[in-house]
Amino acid sequence: MTDQPRSEPLARRDIDVLVLGEINPDVIVRAADPTPSFAQIERFVDSIDLVIGSSSAIFACGAARLGLRTAFVGVVGDDPMGRFMLDALRARGVDVAGCRVDRDVPTGASVILTSGSDRAILTAPGTMPLLRDEDVPQALVARARHVHVGSVFQLDALRPRLAARLGAAHRAGLTTSADCNWDPRETWAGGLWEILRETDVFLPNAAEATRITGTTDVEAAARLLVDAGPRVVAVKCGKDGAIAVARDGTLTRVPSLAVDAVDTTGAGDSFDAGFLAGFLAGRPVLDCLALGVAAGSLSTRGIGGTASQPTLPDAEAAARAAGLLP
């Protein structure tokens, strides 16, 4: 890791969230039953859309939509899909000047088969795992208040240096967060426990939390994870809302928000953005959970992860209407 330049005082830093993560588009195939039939059988579906994909990019768009000044560091290929992603992120207010274009590897992509309530995902990784520690511009770190890492298990080149990267961020006065997302190898290791020691907010879903810890109980999993070092572990539980366990052992629960869901792609990433919007504003864990649930739920009203992401006033209003906020 190269030496960091002197960081600006917190009050003068002009990036609220610096996102380190993967970047790729999604091709969303939507139907009541999107299961394909082989033997050259053609089936008609409701829609096929090319949209902003990748958990980290969806998170970044959600954070920007909520009013956080957001910058992104990732890798794309020198191809139409990479240009599509960079242009789409810029259009949503995300600073992508720190992204690297790889001339040799194509941009990754995911095909998502969704019925609205559930989905299957096929992914060609491409440039997704190629982000390296040396790709992170130190000038951006010096301007940031917070570093968020998306899809820890997919960032193969960065992951071995990630604990050190987050530790350096802490020493420079930043706070940190991470979402692991699903481990495609299903080993649930890869240095995660060391990374958690340098993570202030950890944001897995229920399936990920229980797989990582080898437990079947979500609350027990959250307690094991928070013991590894985070200030708070917030676990997304789908229709059951979300829970959080703080370092002092306090458990907080928030129920789900009823919406007419069209597509659940990226709902967890929008939850992360809502939770961190509260965290960075110094709000209590209950408020952070409520904002996360509201942001995640409202994001499901449109196709793709970003089309229906709410503003902060929209998320707060929805949370209040549901009794999640006073």
Regions found by a protein language model. Name each.
Residues 12, 140-144, 196:
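A short, aliphatic-rich alpha-helical micro-motif
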Residues 2-18, 29, 168, 218-326:
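Conserved phosphate-binding/catalytic region of the ribokinase-like
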Residues 35, 40-43, 50, 65-149, ...:
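Conserved N-terminal subdomain of the carbohydrate kinase-like
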Residues 1-75, 80-87, 91, 260-262, ...:
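Glycine-rich phosphate/adenosyl-contacting loop at the front of the ribokinase-like
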Residues 18, 71, 176-177, 234:
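Structural detector of well-ordered beta-strand residues that form the stable sheet scaffold
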Residues 166-175, 181-253:
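Conserved phosphate/ATP/ADP-binding segment of small-molecule kinases
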Residues 23, 152, 270:
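Active-site metal-binding loops of divalent metal-dependent hydrolases
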